[in-house]
Amino acid sequence: MAITSVIEQMRQLIQLIAKHNHAYYVMDQPTISDSEYDHLFHQLKALEEQYPELVQADSPTTKVGGQALSKFESVTHVVPMLSLGNVFNQEDLFAFARRVEERLPNQKVQYEVELKLDGLAISLWYENGVLVRGVTRGDGETGEDITQNVKTIRNLPKVLHSEKYEIPRLLEVRGEVLMPKSGFEKLNADQEAKGEKTFANPRNAAAGSLRQLDPNIAAARPLAFYAYGIAQCEPNHGLTTMHDSLQWLTELGFQIAERQYLCNSIQEVQQRYEQIQQERPNLQVEIDGMVVKVDDLKQQQQLGFLSREPRWATAYKFPAQAALTTVEQIDWQVGRTGTLTPVARLNPVFVGGVTVSNVTLHNIGEIHRLDVRIGDTVSVYRTGDVIPKVEKVWPEFRPAEAEVVHLPESCPVCASPVVMPEGEALARCSGGLYCAAQRIEAIRHFVSRKAMDIEGLGDRWVESLLRLDLLKDVADIYHLHEHRETLLGIEKMGEKSVQNLIDAIEASKKTTLARFIYALGIRGVGETTARMLANTFQTLEALKAANVEALKKTPDVGDITAEWIADFFLAPHNIEVLDRLIAAGIHWDAPTAPTRQPLNGESWVLTGTLEQMTRDQATQMLQALGARVSGSVSSKTKCVVAGEKAGSKLEKAAKLGIPVMNETDFLSLMAGYGQTLS
C-alpha cells in the first residue's frame, strides 16, 4: 500500500473515531455500537502496528501508557487557580446574591448553575489545538505537570476539532478529573479480586490514579474529565456568557457535567439546588453541591476577585453527612509555631465515604464550648463533605467515668511550659526551635521550595536525620557534610543521593533576605510579609533590633504580627540558631541603595511568550518593587508586558489605552530600579 494511501486511511479512521468519541462522551448520544467502535479502533491499531513510523500525533491509540517518571515537575499557573467561597444554606445564598447585585446596580443578573463535581481540578493547555500540558491545581499558584497521565483519559481530547468554530491559537481549559461511580465500583471489585487495597471513595481513586508516576497505571483506571471553564483564549473566543462558553467547549470536543441551568433569579437557583439534591443518588458521578456563577462574562469582570476567590461565583454545598461515635482519647499535637491543638481520637466511623478516626477540636475554647469529654458520644460530620468535625455532644449518653479535658501545663513533647497570652485563643509551647515537634515542622518549612529551597531534603531524610540525632535545629542542616559516613549508612541512601543532598545544601547558602526571613517560620510571617520586612529593614541586624512600633510601620504587618516578630528575635535560643546559620555561610547580596517601592500598589500584566526571562523571574522583579501581577487586563492595569504571540490581553490593553511594553524595555526599566536577572 502506498504511504500516502496509508496516511489517508489513518486520518479517516482517527477523524471517525474522534467523531464517535464526541457523540458518546460529550453528547451522550452514541451513534454506533461498542463492537463497531472496537472494530474501527482495532483497524487503526493494526495499521499503526504495520506502519509504526506513520503513527499520527493525535491518534486515540497513543493516549494510553508511556514511560514512568521519576517525579512530577512543578509548573507555575499563569492565571492562578483560585478556590471558591462556600455557602451552606438559603440565607447564605441570598446574601451572596445581594453582594453581587449591589455591585451591579440596575443590571439584570442571570446565574449559571452547574454540578459541583467531587474530583480534582486540573488545567489543560492547548497550542493550535494540540494538548501540550496538563497541570494539577496544587496550591493555586503552582501545580504539578501530569501531562502523561491526563493523556490517558479517554474522553479528554488530545487534539481539538470543530466544524463550526476556528480552533484558537492558545487555549487553557479548567476542569475536574473524577471517576464515575460505575467505574469506581468495577475498579474496587478488580482490586479486591487481586487481593489489593480498595479505595474509600471515587475521589481518592481518581487522586491516586492521577498521582501515579507510571502513566500505564493511570491508563488502566476509568478516569473522566469534565470541563467547567476557560482560563485563557488567544485570540479571544468572542463569547459573552458562561453558558455559551460551556456549549462552545462541547463543540471543541470536551465533555461537561450532565446538568447546567440558566436561572433568572436567586430564588430559581434555590429551586435547582433542591432538585439536584433529590437527583444526587441517581447521578453517574459524585457531587458535593452545585456551583453558582454570574453568567455574563462582562459582569464577572466588573465584580472581580477577592484575594483567594472570585466575587462572581460560589459553591453551594450540600448538608454534611453525619454519624455518631465515641471519643476514646484527646491528645495534644504541637505545630510548627508551637500551637497546641487538641485532637479527638474516635472510635472509627464511616462518614460520607471515608473512615474518620481523628478530628481536630481546634483549641481549649472549643472544648469548653462543646463541653466534650473523653468517653462522650458525639455527632461527627464532614464540612462540605471534606473536613471531619464534631458537631454536637450528647450529654444524655455520657458515662459516669467521662473525663473532663484540661489544658496541659507543659508541652507533651519537650516539657517546656505551655503559655496562653491573655485575649488569645491558642495555647503554645514556649520551647521554640528546641522543641522536637516544632523542630520537625520548622525543618520542613525551612527547606521548602519557597524558603531555602533545599531540593531532596524530604520527609524521609528529615525523619532519618532526627532519629540519628543529627538535626536538633535548622542550623544543623549546614553541618551534615561533617557526617558523610553516617549519611551513607542510612537505608537506600547511596553515594549519589548523599552527594546530591550535600550539593543542594551548599547551593542554598546563597539566597535572599526575604527568603531567609520566610524560612525562619516566624508566626504570622508569610512570603509577602517577609518581602516587606526585607525591603523595609534591608539587613537582618536592623530587623533583629527593630521594636514593635518600628515593625508596625512595615506594610502588611499588623499590631499582633509585630509583637510575634519582636518576640521571636527576643528569644535567646532563636538568636543562637540565627548566629549559627550565618556562621555556616548563609548569605545574600547586600542592599545597594535605600529601599524603594516605586511601583507600590500598581497592577501589571504579563502576556505572550517571554524569551529572555521566565514569568516567575518577571513576577519576582515586579513584586520586589511593590507591584502586583494580575492575570487579566482591566482599567486599573498600570502596564502590560508583551512577549511573542501576545493575544487577547494585548487587544484589550489597546482598547482601554493601557501602556504596553516589550520585553527589552521592561528589562531596561527593571535595571534602572536595580532589578536584574539572577
From Swiss-Prot:
Function description: DNA ligase that catalyzes the formation of phosphodiester linkages between 5'-phosphoryl and 3'-hydroxyl groups in double-stranded DNA using NAD as a coenzyme and as the energy source for the reaction. It is essential for DNA replication and repair of damaged DNA.
Catalytic activity: NAD(+) + (deoxyribonucleotide)n-3'-hydroxyl + 5'-phospho-(deoxyribonucleotide)m = (deoxyribonucleotide)n+m + AMP + beta-nicotinamide D-nucleotide
GO biological process annotation, one example: DNA repair
Cofactors: Mg(2+); Mn(2+)
Keyword Nucleotide-binding listed: no
EC number(s) stated in the UniProt entry for this protein: 6.5.1.2
Keyword DNA repair: yes
Superkingdom of source: Bacteria
Binding site for NAD(+): D34, S35, E36, Y37, D38, S83, L84, E114, R137, E176, K293, K317
Binding site for Zn(2+): C411, C414, C429, C435
Residue ranges constituting the BRCT domain according to the UniProt record: 594-678
Classification via PROSITE patterns: BRCT, DNA_LIGASE_N1, DNA_LIGASE_N2
Family of the protein in this entry: Belongs to the NAD-dependent DNA ligase family. LigA subfamily.
Name of the molecule in the record: DNA ligase
Residues forming the catalytic site: K116 (n6-amp-lysine intermediate)
Any one Gene Ontology cellular component term annotated for this protein: cytosol
GO molecular function, one term: metal ion binding
Keywords: DNA damage, DNA repair, DNA replication, Ligase, Magnesium, Manganese, Metal-binding, NAD, Zinc
